[in-house]
């Protein structure tokens, strides 16, 4: 602590022995030892208090940094949540508009397809304008020109042997 060498201690002891005498020297040495011990303990306590305050100060700074970072993260999460909610609300509004348009179009189609009250199952459809009259029976029975060509293509061919039969 004071950086005193052994030779310096011997010199101090000899001077104390001469000044104090052999009767009082042990008592004074004991008292000086107790005082030095108290001083060392006091210095140690002050050092530890200062060290604790420094650590507390560092911890406070660290806590403040963590708190500010947490607030920044919380703020960014809130802004992201708000923007997502706004996007979701706009999408919901667009989907509602689209659904309304589709429902209106479906209702228009249903009104267009629904039979008019004047037309019923009992009404003769051949008398309606734009409906062709009944087809003649001969037209339905006649084969189309593509049908004979197909039947000729399907007929098995006899192998030609070169002999005319």
Curated annotation (Swiss-Prot):
Gene behind the chain: tatB
GO cellular component: TAT protein transport complex
Principal cellular location given in the protein's record: membrane
Pfam families from the UniProt entry: TatA_B_E (PF02416)
Keyword Kinase in record: no
Topology versus the membrane: Single-pass membrane protein
UniProt KW Nucleotide-binding keyword: no
Keywords, in A-Z order: Cell inner membrane, Cell membrane, Membrane, Protein transport, Translocation, Transmembrane, Transmembrane helix, Transport
InterPro entries: TatA/B/E, TatB
Function: Part of the twin-arginine translocation (Tat) system that transports large folded proteins containing a characteristic twin-arginine motif in their signal peptide across membranes. Together with TatC, TatB is part of a receptor directly interacting with Tat signal peptides. TatB may form an oligomeric binding site that transiently accommodates folded Tat precursor proteins before their translocation.
Localization (cell): Cell inner membrane
Quaternary assembly: The Tat system comprises two distinct complexes: a TatABC complex, containing multiple copies of TatA, TatB and TatC subunits, and a separate TatA complex, containing only TatA subunits. Substrates initially bind to the TatABC complex, which probably triggers association of the separate TatA complex to form the active translocon.
Region feature Disordered, mapped onto this chain: 67-165
Family from the record: Belongs to the TatB family.
NCBIfam families: tatB (TIGR01410)
Biased segments, Low complexity type: 127-159
Protein name per its UniProtKB record: Sec-independent protein translocase protein TatB
Transmembrane segments: 1-21
Record GO biological process: protein transport by the Tat complex
